């Protein structure tokens, strides 16, 4: 921007007439406009009135001739606005910008954006005036700001100079547009179209957040971190101000209490997007279809940040009945299955969220079964977050449709869960046990027999891993074991030692599975964890001790005793090396107190 001296109207006129650019014999239209703007600094009210009349007349009559001159005029208005004190004169100067925007929207907005990154009260007042302008002007300005907002910023690009401006090709323009929109949204006098424009701005403000979290250098300096934090804060402010424009802002804000911090966090950004999308569907009925029309093109043609944000919106909005019915089912499931097979863990994680929302609308048993079977392979995913989400989604589906799921699907889920009941990863162990418990609770009494074998197979795993040093994991197994005891009707003998009671029940009531129980325990004697090996040895000893009360034939009892009593003691047995990673995952760190029987508190 050119540097202007602080001169009065007459001096400005003389200076202006000597400038080579304007050597015409008659004053140009631009020159007259600049002279009128400078005259607004006069303290004499008559001079101000004359300048106002002249300026408005020129802009209304000659604005078609100003193409290419708008940036210069905007610079002059901003320069003199900082010195204009008279409220009426300021109003005229700011009104001149609105008149320019009516005919030259793109040039006006672009010129103002170059002054908006380091925004002062003068620029703020100009944006507020544009937000309050008559509808055609206001809508044109908002549309142009949205167009700029859609661009990708780059913080490593050119920074604004001391005068607050930056070059035409600067990638900081989207950040300036964010600030301008924030000013307009905060002003209650500004009217915002609550339709597809509202949806578009929300989506691209959220995408701007994603850009900001990914556009810093690999080793940003302290100044870069501060600048990025400020830009993120400004974008969040704009988003909050826009959400408050809803008819029920308080209800929406209450539901979004936990999402604002998530949106500002690189690690949890997409969780925040999911919460925001759900809140929009719940509190702003009728916008869900508008969201889909904006999101779907980004799914197929957006850059990485746009696509991920669009995927989060897409999966969250599948919870809406109206939006689910608009799209064809095979299109939705096709997208989700493609994402589930993608090499990117985030894609797989989002696909599971989408499948969980699709399940809300399914009533057909076959469709539910196919969906659940499609989720089950995610239990073996390499990413922990994907595994946790798969278990959480299946839990919600089972709880919601417990009376509409085939029993064989229940059996398959519980069978696939068993290795994870004693997994070495505490979060996965807790999630697996929580799902296991809920599935047992949600099972119809008439269907219990079909699941009995799977419950029995889980008892040894749970019993031998009760003393995990991770207390939450250990507690989750104790809770699962209690549910198993209730399921099998083993609650009558609570006055007996729990370990002994369980072994007695297994021997008396399930003699045909004793070999299977002992084989399981024998596998655990190869665990790399000392206390798991100790527990396995003690379990075998306890089962063998109670064999006399078994309905088995004496020859079968003798065979079991001969086969399983020949193990060396724990002190004599070397610690084995287990080369198979799949087998190692079955074991977790367990900590047993070495006693003949475990106290009731452990069960």
Which functions belong to the PLM regions below?
Residues 49, 63, 67-68, 90, ...:
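Intrinsically disordered, low-complexity regions enriched in proline, serine, glycine
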Residues 54-62, 93-102, 126-135, 149, ...:
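Hydrophobic residues within the alpha-helices of tandem HEAT/HEAT-like
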Residues 6-16, 45-58, 85-89, 117-126, ...:
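HEAT-repeat alpha-solenoid elements in large eukaryotic scaffold proteins
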Residues 182-279, 287, 292, 490-494:
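Alpha-helical repeat/alpha-solenoid scaffolds of the HEAT/ARM/MIF4G superfamily
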């Amino acid at each position: 921007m050119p540097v202007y001296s602080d001169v009065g109207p007459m001096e400005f006129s003389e200076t202006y007439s000597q400038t080579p650019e304007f050597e015409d014999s008659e004053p140009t239209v631009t020159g007259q406009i600049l002279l009128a703007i400078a005259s607004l600094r006069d303290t004499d009210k008559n001079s101000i009135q004359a300048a106002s009349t002249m300026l408005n007349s020129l802009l209304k009559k000659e604005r078609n001739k100003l193409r290419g001159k708008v940036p210069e005029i905007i610079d002059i208005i901003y320069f003199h606005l900082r010195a204009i004190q008279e409220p009426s004169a300021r109003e005229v100067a700011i009104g001149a910008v609105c008149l320019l925007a009516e005919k030259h929207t793109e040039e006006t907005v672009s010129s103002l954006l170059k002054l908006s990154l380091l925004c002062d009260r003068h620029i703020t007042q100009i944006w507020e005036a544009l937000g309050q302008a008559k509808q055609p002007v206001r809508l044109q300005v908002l549309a142009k700001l949205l167009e700029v907002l859609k661009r990708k910023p780059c913080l490593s690009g050119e920074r604004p100079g001391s005068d607050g401006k930056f070059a035409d090709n600067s990638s900081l323009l989207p950040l300036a547009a964010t600030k301008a929109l924030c000013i307009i949204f905060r002003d209650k006098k500004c009217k915002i179209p609550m339709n597809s424009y509202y949806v578009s701005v929300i989506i691209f403000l959220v995408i701007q957040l994603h850009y900001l979290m990914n556009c810093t250098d690999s080793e940003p300096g302290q100044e870069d971190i501060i600048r990025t934090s400020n830009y993120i804060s400004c974008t969040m402010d704009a988003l909050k101000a826009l959400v408050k424009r809803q008819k029920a802002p308080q209800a929406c804000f209450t539901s979004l209490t936990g999402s604002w911090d998530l949106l500002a966090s690189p690690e949890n950004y997409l969780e925040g997007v999911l919460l925001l999308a759900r809140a929009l569907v719940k509190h702003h009925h009728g916008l869900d279809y508008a969201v889909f029309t904006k999101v779907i093109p980004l799914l197929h043609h957006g850059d990485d940040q746009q696509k991920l944000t669009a995927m989060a919106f897409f999966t969250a909005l599948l919870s809406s009945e109206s939006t689910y019915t608009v799209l064809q089912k095979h299109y939705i499931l096709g997208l989700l299955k493609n994402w589930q097979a993608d090499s990117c863990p985030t894609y797989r994680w989002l696909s599971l969220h989408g499948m969980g929302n699709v399940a809300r609308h399914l009533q057909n048993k076959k469709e539910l079964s196919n969906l659940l079977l499609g989720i089950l392979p995610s239990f073996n995913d390499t990413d922990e977050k994907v595994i946790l989400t798969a278990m959480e989604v299946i839990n919600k589906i089972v709880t919601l449709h417990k009376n509409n799921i085939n029993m064989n699907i229940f059996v398959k889920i519980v069978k696939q869960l068993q290795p994870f009941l004693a997994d070495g990863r505490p979060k996965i162990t807790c999630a697996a046990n929580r799902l296991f418990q809920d599935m047992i609770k949600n099972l119809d009494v008439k269907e219990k027999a079909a699941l009995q074998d799977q419950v029995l197979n889980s008892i040894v795993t749970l019993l031998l891993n009760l003393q995990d040093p991770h207390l939450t994991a250990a507690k989750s197994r104790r809770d699962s074991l209690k549910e198993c005891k209730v399921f099998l009707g083993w609650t009558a003998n609570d006055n007996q030692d729990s370990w002994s009671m369980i072994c007695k029940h297994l021997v008396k009531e399930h003699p045909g599975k004793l070999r299977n129980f002992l084989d399981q325990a024998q596998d655990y004697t190869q665990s790399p964890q000392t206390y798991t090996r100790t527990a396995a040895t003690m379990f075998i000893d306890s089962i063998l001790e109670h064999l006399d009360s078994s309905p088995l034939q004496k020859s079968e009892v003798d065979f079991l005793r001969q086969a399983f009593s020949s193990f060396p003691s724990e002190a004599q047995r070397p610690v084995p090396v287990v080369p198979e990673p799949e087998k190692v995952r079955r074991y977790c760190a367990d900590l047993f107190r070495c006693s003949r029987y475990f106290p009731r508190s452990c069960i």
